[in-house]
């Protein structure tokens, strides 16, 4: 089985995350996608509670699976109660799924600090890594920095051209903006019903 792993804060998940997952299903020839709501040691703590982020990740998986079972959510990271390193997650999933054919999917915002990750060289050695970019007018995509880090063949870069950011969405939600066009409908409904990010 070829497994793709997509970890993130998902605070909240948005249409860019959905597009990345659908791209993985249609074009990367992977059999299964595992979505993991994480606590990134290199970022500020998530605003939403772990249980809410896991639930929103589950709603993201349900949205993906409407057109065929493909995605599932691992709550292993969130249940640990502290930040977990990507190498630990990958090794855990290798054991659970009895496969070493894992592909790590990451957004370019995380990729820019990839060399700060624990055991980053081991990640390159053991796994395929695909970096998804989001071109943006606000400078969120730094082509020179991306190119510098993509000089070897350890990474594949795919530009989705979807300039969506959970950080910006949280700011807009806190201001009372309607972000329903940027967030999958079931997740938007969950945010509204649970009064998240107000």
Swiss-Prot record:
Its EC number is 2.7.7.18. It catalyses: nicotinate beta-D-ribonucleotide + ATP + H(+) = deamido-NAD(+) + diphosphate. SUPFAM superfamilies: Nucleotidylyl transferase (SSF52374). It holds the Pfam family CTP_transf_like. The gene is nadD. This is Probable nicotinate-nucleotide adenylyltransferase. One of its GO terms (biological process) is NAD biosynthetic process. Keywords: ATP-binding, NAD, Nucleotide-binding, Nucleotidyltransferase, Pyridine nucleotide biosynthesis, Transferase. Catalyzes the reversible adenylation of nicotinate mononucleotide (NaMN) to nicotinic acid adenine dinucleotide (NaAD). The keyword Transferase applies.
